[in-house]
């Protein structure tokens, strides 16, 4: 039986004895954590293993949900996050291993992990923030995944009806595409979505990385809860998103490492 907090208040009680956490941030993402976990475990046989790596674990908001459910959890994130007393106390209480890592491009913290360690790797709301060539990172992740392990990817949908692609006003003003100039100049690097993907493009991404990867499940995901996107939709927009999956705001992809024969086959070049 999957363990899930009864509601958000019960979820917050997990953090309270250890110094609490950011309530506003956790409230905003709570339904994403819950729904993603339900999707994963609805198609995962626990007999396959329970070692889970959360890449970009932040304040352990997602990691804790798996730790209380019997998973052996490891989290990787920036040292400044894992130095927080409340994060360290929560990790100790729930036997979550913390791997501080200041350079995800090379994923140096993962080098201490033995080959074929993890059964599930969470890569949720991370891929859109990457600003570097990720091949070296994926080599490390591939190495520590067991044959048969699954990589879980969630990310915004490039074709989302409420996404930046459909900004007609910006198009008519000839202000280009992608990130806006003021966002690039005024916000820190990892605050941005530097690259958003379509579902087909995301599947192609992993097919190119390695023929050992097999995309075994995929979904266009509706808004996790009203207000999650920070952009009003209205009844008509929500109706369109329900009827046309391509226009839904989020993507969910399960990539299985079916075997370890070819490895990561991409070699970056100038």
Each PLM stretch: what is its role?
Residues 3-33, 78, 89-95, 100-109, ...:
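S-adenosyl-L-methionine-dependent methyltransferase catalytic module, highlighting the catalytic core
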Residues 29-49:
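Conserved alpha-helix/loop element of class I SAM-dependent methyltransferases that forms part
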Residues 48-58:
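Conserved class I S-adenosyl-L-methionine
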Residues 59-70:
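Conserved SAM-binding loop of SAM-dependent methyltransferases across substrates and taxa
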Residues 72-77:
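Conserved SAM-binding motif I beta-strand of class I
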Residues 80-82:
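Helix N-cap at the beta1-alpha1 junction of Rossmann-like dinucleotide-binding domains, i.e.
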Residues 120-132:
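A short SAM/SAH-binding and catalytic strip from SAM-dependent methyltransferases
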């Amino acid at each position: 039986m999957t363990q899930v907090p009864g509601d958000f208040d019960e979820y917050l009680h997990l953090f309270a004895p250890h110094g609490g956490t950011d309530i506003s941030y956790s409230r905003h993402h709570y339904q994403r954590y819950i729904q993603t976990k339900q999707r994963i475990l609805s198609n995962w046989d626990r007999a396959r293993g329970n070692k889970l790596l959360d890449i970009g674990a932040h304040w352990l908001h997602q990691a804790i949900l798996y730790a209380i459910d019997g998973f052996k959890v490891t989290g990787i994130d920036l040292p400044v996050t894992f130095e927080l007393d409340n994060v360290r106390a929560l990790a100790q209480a729930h036997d979550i291993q913390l791997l501080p890592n200041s350079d995800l491009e090379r994923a140096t913290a993962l080098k201490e992990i033995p080959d074929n360690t993890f059964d599930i790797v969470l890569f949720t709301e991370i891929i859109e923030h990457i600003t570097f060539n990720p091949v070296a990172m994926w080599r490390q992740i591939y190495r520590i995944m067991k044959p048969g392990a699954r990589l879980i990817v969630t990310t915004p949908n490039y074709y989302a009806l409420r996404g930046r692609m459909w900004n007609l006003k910006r198009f008519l003003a000839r202000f280009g595409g992608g990130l806006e100039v003021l966002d690039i100049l005024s916000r820190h690097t990892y605050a941005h979505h530097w690259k958003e993907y379509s579902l087909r493009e995301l599947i192609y991404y992993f097919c190119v990385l390695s023929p050992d990867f097999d995309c075994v499940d995929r979904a266009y995901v509706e808004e996790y809860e009203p207000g999650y996107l920070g952009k009003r939709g209205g009844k008509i927009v929500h109706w369109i998103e329900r009827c046309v999956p391509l226009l839904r705001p989020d993507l969910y992809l399960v990539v299985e490492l079916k075997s370890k024969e070819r490895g990561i086959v991409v070699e970056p070049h100038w």
